Amino acid sequence: MAFDISVNASKTINALVYFSTQQNKLVIRNEVNDTHYTVEFDRDKVVDTFISYNRHNDTIEIRGVLPEETNIGCAVNTPVSMTYLYNKYSFKLILAEYIRHRNTISGNIYSALMTLDDLAIKQYGDIDLLFNEKLKVDSDSGLFDFVNFVKDMICCDSRIVVALSSLVSKHWELTNKKYRCMALAEHISDSIPISELSRLRYNLCKYLRGHTESIEDKFDYFEDDDSSTCSAVTDRETDV
């Protein structure tokens, strides 16, 4: 499978390469302005690429050959709809985007996730005090200290982890530490166990359907991508 990407030479290309333990795949994510490219392939595959500069049209050209069984995604300001909630892996991307872009993101799904802030405030009170005084998230070890703080909660209640992660990402974006947001988003979304991911997704669907007044933490749902609670939700109801 061959690919060819051309971008204006004056643009900045942000690339993130990581191994997803949940998907057991190597993931390459590129961002060129508002365009996001995601490539996923098995870790034992070889990817041949060639990057060159075309002086005739002042563009950077990336060409290569990928393994046949490769998932490629490309989105330019793509609206997020409930269809993404049907699949646990796609839902992970939703959480990652929510944590990473908390300051600028909008839409019904993200607005619903923002209601989880109340849980964090109820648990820890003044969030600014928690970040600045207790965790000192702006210090050199701030990212590491925050991850250590929430790691034990990930298997207990992912709702608070998602809330705190999005809030600290929002804080970093305002304090010129935006570079930490991507690392945190990828780590948190990849660290949440499948069971917790399914539970959060299930309860989020119920909330968006109007079946509950808040995103609950019930565990009456087992891993099943064909759950009627999720599949009954239409794009029309949740387009953002």
UniProtKB/Swiss-Prot annotation:
<keyword id="KW-1090">Inhibition of host innate immune response by virus</keyword>
<comment type="similarity">
    <text>Belongs to the orthopoxvirus OPG176 family.</text>
</comment>
<comment type="function">
    <text>BCL2-like protein which disrupts the host immune response by inhibiting the TLR4 signaling pathway leading to NF-kappa-B activation. Acts close to the plasma membrane and targets several host TIR-domain containing adapter proteins including MYD88, TIRAP, TRIF and TICAM2. In turn, blocks the host NF-kappa-B and TRIF-mediated IRF3 activation.</text>
</comment>
<dbReference type="InterPro" id="IPR043018">
    <property type="entry name" value="Poxvirus_sf"/>
</dbReference>
<keyword id="KW-1092">Inhibition of host IRF3 by virus</keyword>
<comment type="subunit">
    <text>Tetramer. Interacts with host MYD88, TRF4, TICAM2 and MAL.</text>
</comment>
<dbReference type="InterPro" id="IPR022819">
    <property type="entry name" value="Poxvirus_Bcl-2-like"/>
</dbReference>
<dbReference type="GO" id="GO:0039548">
    <property type="term" value="P:symbiont-mediated suppression of host cytoplasmic pattern recognition receptor signaling pathway via inhibition of IRF3 activity"/>
</dbReference>
<keyword id="KW-1100">Inhibition of host NF-kappa-B by virus</keyword>
<keyword id="KW-0244">Early protein</keyword>
<keyword id="KW-0945">Host-virus interaction</keyword>
<keyword id="KW-1113">Inhibition of host RLR pathway by virus</keyword>
<protein>
    <recommendedName>
        <fullName>Protein OPG176</fullName>
    </recommendedName>
</protein>
<dbReference type="GO" id="GO:0039722">
    <property type="term" value="P:symbiont-mediated suppression of host toll-like receptor signaling pathway"/>
</dbReference>
<dbReference type="Pfam" id="PF06227">
    <property type="entry name" value="Poxv_Bcl-2-like"/>
</dbReference>
<dbReference type="GO" id="GO:0085034">
    <property type="term" value="P:symbiont-mediated suppression of host NF-kappaB cascade"/>
</dbReference>
<dbReference type="GO" id="GO:0140311">
    <property type="term" value="F:protein sequestering activity"/>
</dbReference>
<keyword id="KW-0899">Viral immunoevasion</keyword>
<dbReference type="GO" id="GO:0031234">
    <property type="term" value="C:extrinsic component of cytoplasmic side of plasma membrane"/>
</dbReference>
